């Protein structure tokens, strides 16, 4: 039977991608249905209990700047907050928070249940309704059919998921959850390229069996950072430390002597694992010269005794896992409460997607999260928001939107996936972005909130706060530009006490702030330049904008040059065999990828600058050279 009411957008899956997709579509006023196999696991952290990190924290801030959920949820659930790379420049500083799994899940579910235009329904999906190469609905395991104008697939590791512990394996979407086998079969029938990937998780340890007295503590930052531009530190629950232990030669001997029982090394697992989150087996074998590896013991929550040992992801048999755990300092009597495991699952080649994350072959069908070959909650959330907003726009007969590489890490993520594809789980790093100085955590709202407002993602409260911040930045910069001190002025001695070289000529507040030894905090304690802004976010922007003004202007010039190529569009139906002068390799790659622009074509492996020049000349001769607005 068909459900009596039609929907604009259906989201399949309630993980980090699915929840952001559902919230985005509903915020934009579209009637949205979130289908999940279990309402109690909405927003579940399947692996490590943490949000953020290098590159990842940037994505969370961008999701927040566009009105998303993740940053608000972690502000209510984070039990240890830190700034990584705090001593480095603002481009690579990143926020990370340890999470209480239960509080995080509660925050996500509460937000979903209070979101207008959103209905949640518990049933596994087994089929899609496709008519004339367009998706028009979904079918659940009890045969109930839902109609919609767009469908977003955010199914994580559930598609034909297979869990491995030692040489034993069984079907599962994650520990304790069933896989989605019928949906996997259905998707394999569609004209989509499919592959297998693998990820893993470590055993969980009973905290009561660990001797923390012999371990080093790791505390959070002070003052405590905040993830959401709308948040404050008073929202954070009780803060707790993490602990550090290490593997040793005994640990490594145990692993080496049991490699024949590892599903990876025995050839049982065919999927490729994440390069930047390797299993402990991989670390021991790949870095054979290392006699130890650092392991972080991270609490899973304020009401849980479980500890997540970050760094020993493994699929070795349970008896070997016990030996590994008990070989480390402080863990000699430790008990495992959940075994570690590896999981293999289907993913679909993201090169078959438009930058909006809509399929090139099935109209109205969007993909987000691990199904696209990524790893990580943050990467999933960012894709979910983008897919959700574009599904909503499609259902309202509006053009899709995707950020450029120069606009957001989300733009880098999507462009990398859609242009280059991936053969291993893709993780975001700051090093993947060409324009890191422009794409900082601290200015995510300045880059994206106005766009989010135009798209219908940003509510009145956030918009008012954003405009107040803009006014504070502009007013303070004008004040510092117009406030001067001369070498002969009475205040000069007070200013000189904070400088490595005394004033030799008249200087404005901005001139002084550009000096390496001067900070905004110091400057605004000096008589001519007091008082400081009470808006800490605006104060941070003033300092960064002034200190890095020259570098930022230079990078903006680079972006404008790059945009000329990025905005030169390529016809979707162009057969590159028509372009004389291109090599067979370049023709094959361009016909395979079907890039949307010259900029995208230039990032395809094997497409040379010479080939791009030939293509530009040919387009001009054919009268096909056109640029987007």
From Swiss-Prot:
Residues at which NAD(+) binds: 273-287
Cofactor(s) in the UniProt record: FAD
Residues that hold FAD according to the record: 13-18, 125, 180, 370
Keyword Nuclease annotated: no
Chief location of this protein within or outside the cell: cytoplasm
Top-level taxon: Bacteria
Pfam families recorded: GIDA, GIDA_C_1st, SAM_GIDA_C
UniProt-annotated location(s): Cytoplasm
Keyword tags: Cytoplasm, FAD, Flavoprotein, NAD, tRNA processing
Xref: InterPro entries: FAD/NAD-bd_sf, GIDA_C_N, MnmG, MnmG-rel, MnmG-rel_CS, MnmG_C, MnmG_C_subdom, MnmG_C_subdom_sf
Gene Ontology CC entries for this record: cytosol
GO biological process: tRNA methylation; tRNA wobble uridine modification
Gene Ontology molecular function: any one: flavin adenine dinucleotide binding
Keyword Lyase: no
Purpose of the protein: NAD-binding protein involved in the addition of a carboxymethylaminomethyl (cmnm) group at the wobble position (U34) of certain tRNAs, forming tRNA-cmnm(5)s(2)U34.
Quaternary structure (record): Homodimer. Heterotetramer of two MnmE and two MnmG subunits.
Protein family (similarity comment): Belongs to the MnmG family.
Protein's name according to its UniProt entry: tRNA uridine 5-carboxymethylaminomethyl modification enzyme MnmG
Protein source organism: Shigella boydii serotype 18 (strain CDC 3083-94 / BS512)
Gene (UniProt): mnmG
